[in-house]
A protein has these predicted regions:
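Conserved beta-strand scaffold positions in the cores of enzyme catalytic domains, especially
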Residues: 29, 43, 100, 167, ...
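Active-site-adjacent mobile loop/cap segments within catalytic or ligand-binding domains
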Residues: 177-179, 188, 206-253
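Short, conserved catalytic or adaptor-binding loops enriched in Gly and charged residues
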Residues: 20-23, 91, 215-219
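Active-site/substrate-binding loop(s) of hydrolase catalytic cores
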Residues: 58-65, 74-202, 229-230
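Soluble metallo-hydrolase cores and metallopeptidase-like ectodomains found primarily
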Residues: 23-57
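Extracellular mucin-like PTS domains
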Residues: 1-22
Length: 253
């Protein structure tokens, strides 16, 4: 890690119920960009945990990023984000610096639609082996060019800046996690075991412009993978996924 982001736009604090003393913030929220329609794309940094206090160049520091929503009609990942925000500091490994990105597609979340406001599938718009797919109105439209969308640009810049050691990208509704023959294979298998997700390949072949693929191929020392949740996610299941994310950190290659 060479850079840490510490420029919040808003601060969440907890205050005492008996005094006016302001306690240290549990998290900081900052905007990393705006959507087509001008909505903020916010990231949350858990600053109350020991890992957030480690020096940027500390070899023990592990930066973990969790992305709840890319496709606006796949919102179950938000429940996992909620559980990670609610965890006590003692539940989070001391070396983990935890960052949470609820959605990169606020314009899709608002009307519960897959695409952004330009009708672009953001998970076909990232700048790795991007290819033109379909046209506006098609569910898989990749946009007019690689990283054409402000949401994609914001995430590319932020990930390039933060350089997470591990990123989990949530999707729905395949209820699976893709296996890997690479160095992150044991990590994916452990996640599947902890959550009960079956290990199986993504249907439909190889896709272009995918966020997690862009991240893996651009930053080869980083681990990034997709978790496909089912159609629904109960609170207990969301908590299981939250704990699984933290439990696999020691398996990072």
């Amino acid at each position: 890690m060479t850079v840490a982001v510490e420029v919040p736009t808003t601060t969440s604090t907890t205050t005492s119920t008996t005094t006016s003393t302001t306690l240290p913030p549990t998290e900081l929220t900052m905007s990393i960009g705006t959507s087509v329609q001008g909505r903020a794309i916010d990231v949350v940094h858990r600053v109350d945990i020991p890992g957030a206090q480690l020096a940027v160049d500390d070899p023990n520091r592990v930066v973990v990023l969790v992305v709840g929503v890319i496709h606006g009609d796949e919102q179950a990942g938000l429940e996992v984000i909620k559980e990670l925000r609610a965890m006590l500091p003692s539940e989070i490994p001391a070396n983990v610096d935890l960052w949470l990105l609820p959605t990169i597609n606020p314009d899709g979340v608002a009307p519960y639609q897959r695409h952004n406001a330009n009708q672009v599938d953001l998970n076909r718009n990232f700048p790795y082996k991007w290819g033109m797919i379909a046209e506006p109105g098609n569910w898989e439209y990749s946009g007019p060019s690689a990283a054409s969308e402000p949401e994609t640009q914001a995430v590319v810049d932020f990930v390039t800046y933060l350089r997470p050691d591990m990123t989990v990208w949530f999707h729905q509704e395949e209820f699976s996690i893709a296996p890997s023959t690479g160095s992150d294979g044991p990590l994916r298998r452990a996640y599947a075991r902890l959550t009960g997700l079956p290990l199986k390949g993504v249907p439909g072949g190889t896709y272009t412009g995918v966020a997690a693929t862009w991240q893996r191929k651009t930053f080869t020392d980083d681990t990034a993978f997709i978790v496909e949740l089912g159609p629904t996610l109960a609170q207990g299941e969301a908590l299981t996924h939250a704990h699984a994310i933290l439990s696999i950190v020691p398996l990072l290659p």
